[in-house]
Amino acid sequence: MLYSYTEKKRIRKDFGKRSQVLDVPYLLSIQLESFQKFIERDNEGQHGLEAAFRSVFPIQSYSGNAELQYVSYHLGEPVFDVKECQTRGLTFSAPLRVILRLIIRDATTETPIKEQEVYMGEIPLMTENGTFVINGTERVIVSQLHRSPGVFFDSDKGKIHSSGKVLFNARIIPYRGSWLDFEFDQKDHLFVRIDRRRKLPATIILRALQLSTNQILDTFFEKVIFHLNDEHIQMELVPERLRGETASFDIIANGTIYVNKGRRITARHIHQLKIDSIDRINVPREYLVGKIIAIDYIHDNTGEIIVPANIEITLEILDKLGKANFKRIETLFTNDLDHGAYISETLRIDSTRDRLSALVEIYRMMRPGEPPTREAAENLFENIFFSEDRYDLSAVGRMKFNRALLREEIEGSGLLSKSDIIEVMKKLIDIRNGKGEVDDIDHLGNRRVRSVGEMAENQFRIGLVRVERAVKERLSLSDLESLMPQDIINAKPISAAIKEFFGSSQLSQFMDQNNPLSEITHKRRISALGPGGLTRERAGFEVRDVHPTHYGRVCPIETPEGPNIGLINSLSVYAKTNEYGFLETPYRLVHNSVVTEEIHYLSAIEEGNFIIAQANTNLDDKGNFVEELVTCRHKGESGFFSREKVHYMDVSTQQIVSVGASLIPFLEHDDANRALMGANMQRQAVPTLRTDKPLVGTGMERIVAVDSGVTVVAKRGGIVQYVDASRIVINVHSDEMYSGEAGIDIYHMTKYIRSNQNTCISQKPCVTLGELVERGNVLADGPSTDLGELALGQNMRIAFMPWNGYNFEDSMLVSERVVQKDCFTTIHIQELACMSRDTKLGPEEITSDIPNVGEAALCKLDESGIVYIGAEVTSGDILVGKVTPKGETQLTPEEKLLRAIFGEKASDVKDSSLRVPNGYSGTVIDVQIFTRDGVKKDKRTLEIEEMQLQQAKKDLTEERRIFEAALFTRIRHVLGSDITNIDIVKILKLKREDWSQFNIKDNNKYCQLEQLAEQYYELNKVFANKLEEKRRKITQGDDLSPGVLKIVKVYIAVKRQIQPGDKMAGRHGNKGVISKINPIEDMPYDEKGIPVDIVLNPLGVPSRMNIGQILETHLGMAAKGIGDKINKMLKQHKNAEQLRQFIQKAYDIGDQVRQKVNLNLFSDQEILLLAENLKHGMPMATPVFDGAKEKEIKQMLQLAELPVSGQITLFDGRTGEPFERQVTVGYMYMLKLNHLVDDKMHARSTGSYSLVTQQPLGGKAQFGGQRFGEMEVWALEAYGAAYTLQEMLTVKSDDVNGRTKMYKNIVDCNHTMEPAMPESFNVLLKEIRSLGINIELEKN
């Protein structure tokens, strides 16, 4: 395998056996592609903004004499870039401009056409990492898994009716519009509901579709024809129809008895009747009784109906028909087995007789209480299902609809037709008759994914429809000649709809920015909740459960614990959505029992037809199956199939899991419940100050780190020309350069930015000067990455043993070394904001002149009243001094005297400064001031602006210098290498005709020089414009919300070391709280004197069944052992060849591993660099379901000269005695989770009280108290601590007078209390009185 220069720095040993046929796709593509589809011009008009515009335009006036047409749209450039939007609290968006054409049709004059570009609001843009910046915060739009439009056949599984009878139903769900339901009741009548309203007999909708009773019966039933003769009745025989019936008379034909009376008619009888070609048999008169007439029988002469259709035959009716001389009677063919008379019976309970009465009935159901007119009834019915404005099945819906009805074509109209409705009813009746199956609603073929683009398009369309109504009104005005398109369109409704969606929709979520993995997982999340989806309360067990079709599409492991379990899922690693929005997963094609490299993506529906082998099936070198019988999946079931029958094979072993779960090594040895916790807890890991790659990984770490966008990745290959903490400059390879450009790429680092979760985002370069980089190489590490690999935690030396009860119940004993080495030290950045508003009494003022505040409290503020950068602040310190004017109050004589002496100012303002909240402390790292346009800027603001300007100037000058240097180098190629930069500048300033003195004979060179001179002038122009633009942005006033004059934001950074009470976890769901930080000398140590870092409880393993952690510990020990051996060799100054041989030996361990590392291709310098990076441990990759085997782990331990059992003798640090038994010791990757004791620790003496009960509030956010609940009261009762109990229930809780007296007593050093009536007792009295029961308290 070929490695690039940066990849050679540290190669992860891979134990994977299966070849990688398909690379992991770009992990954020679901978001980026969907949004791209939304904003890209689509000439077909199928997707995005174009589709929305075409669906609403053209808009015609009510009279039809004016029309507003849509021509085209384009998106402008955003005013501010992403970083500027984040600092200013703005939305990163682009203006949408649409060209509209107004046509006024006038019979008298020529038709004037006015065309104009109209502004239609701002469209938020997606950043390159798949997020949106809305009001300065990064948000993610989560994709939604909703029920696909189409038709679904279902049953109630016998739950609705007490008899347990299964009632079937069908539901037509459009993409937008009214739902149409058909359902059977317990009497087998078929009903219809529109939008889940009151049910009506289903035949009403058929009558509304202009079908008569005869046509309805014709459509749904076959007919049986009887011929009446004078002496007997003959029936036209279709033998198949007799199957399973009991003969009620002897079946005789041509003198032969085929079936005796009372016998069941079997297949043999039918076969005999067919052979003998019997087409008529005689039947007794009684046989016709109970049969149903199929058509109206009308008197030839009078035209009156003698016998109407759908009537049961009686002997009287037979006589009537005989008298009227009807020789042929048509009846409906029904039976109890597979031809139920459901529609016939429904017709009998249907009170309507014609189309009008059916339409009126539907109108009454949809609009109860309104008087129906013919026109209104017809319009309503037409609009419900047959109007393009109100109803759309969409391409997906039509495809699903036609597939469900087994039609050939899958495209068609978005509206329902008469035949659609009839066929759905027919299929539902077939299912009731026992032919066909109901659909599985949880099958992924019936659920589709709606991503950002589609949801934004729907919102945009809603906004456009609101605009349409207003436009129609305006087009009907008389003075149209004077109007232009922009006077007719008001863009507010569109902006409002878009803003509401991105700002407050349930699926627009505050991005989880704890670490790179949590970002990626959030963007790949799929939720069944949200508008048009399920609700937590109504979602049953089936919807939440893992379904066979989830395989390779949705992760069966990663889902939240709690009420959302199973409703929020994660996309599998290789899954993608197809054009219809259904999830697909890739498979390798198997051709004649040979597995090919050809990849096919299959949706859940397509997959059902194939037999698919698992990814871990053994193949020979040519891709043939080794075993005769192969483990495969078919129609959701697993089993053995012969290799000739296999159609496809899985692409990878990690195909079924999500990104989060694919990062858990030895996942295959963990119980699913613990794996779920492990996958979820990795997302809560806080980025540590010093990152450390996992010794035992899965090989997905690099992919996640690069795709998450937190690292800086080279866009083009080249040589590192300059590198410092804030920028990297790459001199691009000539073959990757565009013509006429300088060939320089500059990458800027992000420094100490606050994330959404208050963690710290900072990037640091991981390349050195002169290094060769290629496209896609990592140039700088971000938070939680180490040399371009995801590094969420730290490798800790752990031992599984009890230690004096300090690791009881999952607690952890941690060594002081971990604190000293800053292993789990994290930086947290808090943002605090102070607003100065314009109040009724005057503006609030930000100042250092605050009434009644001493000098000491103001010592950290500058003269503008704002804290200076670098100040160490603790809770209660003033960050921004602010005074608010207060209304006139009645002054006491003393105050009047003071005002007379000291002037007005002191008492007409009150202190409303921004202070550090309780429990926070840290260092001020940044201050930002935003001033409204037109408000005078204070001194500090001007200083900050000046500083930003100088920085921008410096950066741009430096950038320009770099580009200039590259240009000058190319000019030297033309003019000769001995020319100086000063001369070059002089030459470029000369006129073209003065160049003749340089004797440039070559015309080609002359052209080159001309081109370079052009570039030089262009460069100067571009940088002058950039600087001017920067200056404008820095000095312009800010657009603040109404009434706000100034906003000051202060950022405080705090360094948090690990301490008892912090929550930590491994990657296998093994979580716990630190119980004690132990001195290093007291920790257990091994024979070499190396102490362990963390002691875990061995009882945490067997019951949890997450054995993966033990295997990780062993392999981690081997990885560290090999690193130690390399370190030892480096210390002994062994030469590169010896190092090469030893490292090669480590890479060669393992049977049939896919990774082939040939260190002979590495130079000695590269080997030494590799060894330097491996000396702290050789990182290993053990991919999910394809990981290291026990034998391989033992080989690694042997190479590291460690005991193969993985257990060693430990000694007690306090006594020096060896422990009785050997202990499992090794290296495990531990994470510090974002549940820090500092954020949870809280104490209160006095504070706020609840208004009604007068009891202290609860919770840290409200600065509340600790609840003394009923169980605690029982505890005090049990010990008879009556006075303590009285104090708890009165003065410490809600006895208002008692607690104020208590203050006074404490001040007077009188330690007694006088408890009175608790306020909550008064509340109880009032509640009882509200029930009408009077209670009086008697005082004795």
Curated annotation (Swiss-Prot):
GO molecular function: DNA binding; DNA-directed RNA polymerase activity; ribonucleoside binding
GO cellular component, one term: DNA-directed RNA polymerase complex
Principal EC category: transferase
Keyword annotations of the record: DNA-directed RNA polymerase, Nucleotidyltransferase, Transcription, Transferase
GO BP terms, alphabetized: DNA-templated transcription
Catalytic activity: RNA(n) + a ribonucleoside 5'-triphosphate = RNA(n+1) + diphosphate
Entry's EC annotation: 2.7.7.6
NCBIfam families: PRK00405.1 (NF001616), rpoB (TIGR02013)
Family named by the database record: Belongs to the RNA polymerase beta chain family.
UniProt xrefs under PANTHER family: DNA-DIRECTED RNA POLYMERASE I SUBUNIT 2 (PTHR20856)
Name of protein: DNA-directed RNA polymerase subunit beta
Organism: Baumannia cicadellinicola subsp. Homalodisca coagulata
Protein encoded by which gene: rpoB
